[in-house]
Amino acid sequence: MRNVTLTDIFQLPFARKYLKRAGLAHAVTVTQKAYDLACKEAVNTDLATKAALLHDIGHYTWYRDGEWDFDLYKQNDIHAIKGAERAHKMLIRLGENPEAAKEIAVAILFHTDSYFQGTVQRTSLQEVVAQADEADEEPNGNHHYKVISESEAAEMLADLDDMIEKQCHSNTHLQQSV
C-alpha cells in the first residue's frame, strides 16, 4: 500500500501551481516515461514516478524585456535544488514515508547537471528520472510549453496510479508466496 499517490500530489493546489509553471504536459510525459523505464530497469516505480512528476517544480521562468531568455535561465538555473526541497516538504506533509521522500527529493536534485560542473554518479532511481526527462527534452526548453488540460493530466496520472498499485500488489503477493 502506497502512502501517497500521484493523484494525491496532483490534487494539491500548491503542486498544480508549480507543475503548470514548469509545464504540466512535460511533467506527465516524463512520469509516463519514468514508469516504463523503471519497469524495464527493475527500479521502484512508485518512487520513480513521483520524482518524475515533481522533477521540475523548482523552475523559475527567466524573462528579459518580456521574452523568455533561455540563455539567462541556463546561466542561473538552480531549479533542481529548489524543486528537491519543495517536493520533500510536500511529500512529508502528505504523509509519505520519510525515507521515500528523501529518495524522491535526491532523485529530483540529480535529474539534471545544469547547475553544477562535472559529473555525478547516479543511483538507478536517479538515472531513470534523468533519462525520462532527457527523452522529452526539446531545443530551447520548448518541452515546457506543451499543453495538456488538468483533467487529461489527472486521468493519465490516475491510470499510472492503477498500474503502480497493481504492480505493488503483485510484488507483495509474490513475496508472500516465496
PLM region descriptions:
Residues 30, 34-37, 77-93:
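An active-site-proximal "capping" alpha-helix that borders the catalytic cofactor pocket
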Residues 17-29, 70-82:
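Active-site metal-coordination segments of metallo-dependent hydrolases
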